[in-house]
Amino acid sequence: VLLVACLVTCAVGSLLYFAHADINKRTDGKGVQVDIPHEVMHHLADSYDWHFTTFGETHVTLHLPIIVKSCVDGEWHVFTSHDVPDGFYFDENHHGKVYERAADGTPVKPWDFSITKLVAQLIIVVVLLLSIFLSCARWYKKRDETSPAPRGFVGTIEMLVMYIHDDVIRPCVGEHQYKKYANYLLTMFFFIFTTNLVGLIPGAANVTGNINVTLFLAFCTMLAINVFANKIYWKEILWPDVPWWLKFPIPLMPAIEIFGIISKPFALMIRLFANMMAGHAVMLSFTCVIFFGTTLGLGAGMGLNLFSVIMLLFMYALEVLVAFVQAYVF
């Protein structure tokens, strides 16, 4: 019941968020004209402000700090998109990134260390995870081995941690090596899972739908695997147990295994990015479809709106499952 209530709330919130954000500027008397590809890409993209919704002519927006080091005067500048100083502007030809003009008018890209919408949500996720696990740690410190098993929220977290630790990491990595990787893999799982779930909240950013984030996660995983690997792992990479003619004189299998060091993290990166971006794009598309109901008759419009809401609920339920599966696979 709680899950259904959450899904309905998120679906209705998405409709209200999208409606207030775009309906006011696209009504021409005949209905609402929505450019679905433009709206989808706009909501998936990163930005220097966090736009939540619009009521009439009032925009509810959080202007995030833009921190750049100028390549023209060499100075640091801190401002927001609401108050851009002279010499800086947002270049729409470069996805709205901040640029500055040199003395001769040439566009120059400064060193950009801004807290964008994606960065802000990453900070929120990190604070949320620290709050969850530190509170659970305090609960355990107050008890000993004779205390009853935890219930409620702490019990749910323990169940999830033990499932990933005992049923996933331990059998997959091996009895002798799993302790070395357990902390990293648990951290990676809960970070991706929480980030995916937070991204489903209406108005939130799609962090794991950004290729830069998944690239960094895949790079960290590649380092963790290869830096802490033992000699058995490298023996299977450089001299695998295959017929000798596959290794000498042409090292076919070693070359394939070495290529796999890069291709496997690359596959993880693309899989997480593509699944999360596609899921959000489909949900946004179904949200946009509801506005076409105003251009149809009453009966057809109500039918289209009902179809859109049902499909949006289905996609939300599917995305909750995908959020867990993608964290599990990664």
Which residue ranges define each predicted feature?
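Perimembrane topogenic segments of multi-pass inner/organellar membrane proteins
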Residues: 1-151
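Membrane-interface helix caps and helix-loop-helix hairpins in membrane proteins
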Residues: 201-207
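Alpha-helical transmembrane segments and their helix-start/interface "positive-inside/aromatic belt" motifs
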Residues: 2-4, 118, 180-184, 208-211
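Hydrophobic alpha-helical transmembrane segments and adjacent short intramembrane/lumenal linkers
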Residues: 182, 187-201, 212, 216, ...
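Hydrophobic transmembrane alpha-helix segments characteristic of membrane transport
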Residues: 131-172, 234-236
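Membrane-interface alpha-helices at helix entry/exit sites of multi-pass transporters
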Residues: 171-172, 176-180
